[in-house]
Every structure is written in C-alpha cells, then in structure tokens.
C-alpha cells in the first residue's frame, strides 16, 4: 500500500491492507421510475402476419420455425408492434429494428433462466432461431417493453445494425438471459435507459454503457460481472438496483469516470463486491453484503477493492455472511482493500 489519501469525517478504524466490517446507519431512498412508453394506440399485432401453422409453432413447447418474416413484414406497416403472449416463444434472427421502432409484449420475467425451458409459458418470450445470429439488430431510438429475451453465450443481447455506437435505446420490464452480454458490448458503447428489467444468467450482465440511466432492476447470477464499465464508459447513473450472486464482481469499473451508484443492494459476489481501478465513482446509500463468497485470495474477499483512483463513499452499510442456507464461506475478510494511489472520502459509513 502507498500514497493512500484519506479525507475523513466519520470513518472506520482500519487494519493493514484492509478495513474491518462495522455496521452503520442507513437512510433508505427508493427512486420511483416513470412510465416511458406510450399507450396501446397505434400498435399492431404480429399475429396476423404469422402463418397459422407458425402461430401454433410459437405456442408449442419446442418451437422450431423461423418467425422473422412476420416481424419484418409487420415493421413495413408500422413502427409499433405488439407481440402477444404465447405458450412457447417466438424465434427471430437478424431482424433489423429501424429507427423509432417500439416492440411491446407482456411477460413474467423469471429470476434466473439457465435453460430455454425456463422462459416457456412466461408470455411474450423471444429467442434466436440461429445460435450464430442475434435476435435483433438495433438502430438508434428503439424501445422494448415487456419482452423476455433468451439468447446464447456467443452473442450479445443488443447488436448494432451498423457496427457503431447505439444510442437512445429504452428498455422497460424486459428480461435478458443467457447472452454473452445482456445489455451492452465489449467493442462499442451503448446509450440506454433501463427500467424494471431483469438481467440474469448471462456471461456479463451489463457492459460499457455511457450517458445512461439504469433503475429499479435486478442484475443477478451472471457468470462473470454484474456490471462491467471499461475505458470511457462514463457518465452513468445506477439507482434502486439489486446486484447479486454474480460470479466475479457485482460492479467492475476500470478507467471510467463520473459514475454514480445509489440506493442499491449488492450481495454475495464471488470476488470483491465493487472493483475500482484508476476510476472515479460516487457510492451513496447502498448496502454491500457477503462479498467474496468464492474467493480464496484475501484481497479479493472484500466489499470494495480500490486499485488507484478516487471514490466518494457516503452512507453505506457493510455486512458479512454465508449463503442463504447458512452454508458456504463466511465473507468478506475486509470492508475496503486499497492499493496503489487511491483517494477516498468516506462519511457516515
């Protein structure tokens, strides 16, 4: 450890390489999201565009046919398409969603979806017909509401139609399951507003969003990271989130600035609950619990691992614990583990 600058008001007594876990007071605030989608006026159903045999296929327990043609033809008639609930799921591939498209359905979103069978009977569920092709390709200004999307670990949930940055995407009451990245990309940035969504069972839940707002959502049980922000993934607001049971870090931030996470709960990450490297972040009014549940390396068994950069930490509670069944590793070893040049301002925590 070196050059760690602590500016403190109310702070925890610390030990070498880490800080002990102590409870603090917490003032709860819950952000209330507003409805960002229009009414039903102007929507047309995809059903009349489906061959009757293909409608039966959508409602089977194992759909086999490509239904892309129906959505493509419906989009020629209107930019506002309704996907009615089905007993199975729709199968699409490479459907380009033009600027201004709004797709709407009605879905019950499973907490996790480890198999495509988990979305059967959940309503307006969609999967990819060809495992090598994305379900949709996005242009700017596209909105999805009430859809349960199930992909595969070789493709991302949001693919650019042009190969460049995708902007002004709105997602409400949607589920993203079994993608390489549920929302976002490792190669391009995406500007997106996310409200009341479930992002679960992907390799990475959310990646490289910029100028975005994410609220009232669950980011759960992703293989690696819940949220990963890399170089330049700046200027995001995360609020009222439940980020839990992600295999590595619930929140990973490297070389990114001007990000705020507030009024959220981060629980039972495999490694550090929050990993910060050469980044700037504000953490406000959050609970961090049981971090480092699968790590055998002490510095990774911590609520916050900061490796250079700046963090303002205000009104947080940290708690240790085991798995929900009382078994598993008691973690973490530290509240905060800091190395390299790090500047922390910690208050009321």
Predicted ranges, named:
Residues 25-49:
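C-terminal segment of N-terminal export signals and the immediately downstream linker at the start
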Residues 84, 98, 104-106, 145, ...:
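Feature marks extracellular polysaccharide-active and adherence modules
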């Amino acid at each position: 450890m070196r050059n760690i600058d602590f500016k403190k008001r109310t702070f925890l007594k610390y030990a070498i390489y880490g800080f002990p876990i102590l409870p603090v007071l917490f003032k709860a605030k819950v952000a209330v999201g507003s409805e960002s989608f229009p009414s039903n006026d102007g929507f047309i159903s995809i059903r009349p565009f489906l061959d009757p045999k293909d409608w039966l296929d959508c409602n089977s327990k194992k759909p086999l046919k490509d239904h892309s043609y129906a959505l493509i033809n419906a989009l020629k008639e209107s930019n506002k398409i309704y996907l009615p609930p089905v007993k199975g799921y729709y199968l699409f591939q490479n459907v380009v969603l033009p600027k201004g498209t709004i797709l709407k359905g009605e879905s019950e979103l499973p907490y996790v979806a480890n198999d495509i069978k988990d979305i059967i009977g959940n309503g307006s569920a969609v999967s990819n017909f060809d495992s090598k092709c994305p379900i949709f390709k996005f242009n700017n200004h596209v909105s999805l509401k009430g859809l349960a999307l199930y992909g595969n670990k070789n493709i991302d949930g949001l693919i650019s139609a042009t190969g460049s940055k995708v902007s002004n995407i709105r997602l409400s009451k949607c589920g993203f399951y079994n993608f390489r990245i549920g929302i976002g990309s490792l190669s391009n940035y995406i500007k997106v507003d996310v409200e009341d969504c479930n992002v679960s069972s992907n390799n990475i839940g959310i990646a490289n969003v910029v100028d975005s707002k994410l609220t009232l959502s669950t980011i759960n049980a992703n293989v690696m990271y819940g949220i990963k922000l890399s170089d330049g993934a700046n200027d995001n607001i995360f609020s009222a989130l439940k980020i839990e049971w992600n295999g590595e870090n619930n929140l990973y931030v490297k070389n990114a600035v001007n990000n705020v996470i507030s009024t959220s709960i981060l629980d039972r990450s495999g490694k550090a609950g929050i990993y910060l490297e050469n980044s700037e972040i504000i953490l406000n009014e959050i609970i961090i619990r049981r971090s480092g549940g699968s790590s055998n390396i002490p510095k990774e068994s911590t609520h916050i691992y900061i490796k250079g950069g700046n963090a303002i930490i205000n009104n947080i509670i940290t708690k240790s614990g085991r798995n929900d069944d009382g078994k598993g590793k008691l973690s973490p070893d530290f509240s905060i583990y800091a190395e390299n040049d790090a500047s922390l301002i910690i208050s009321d925590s």
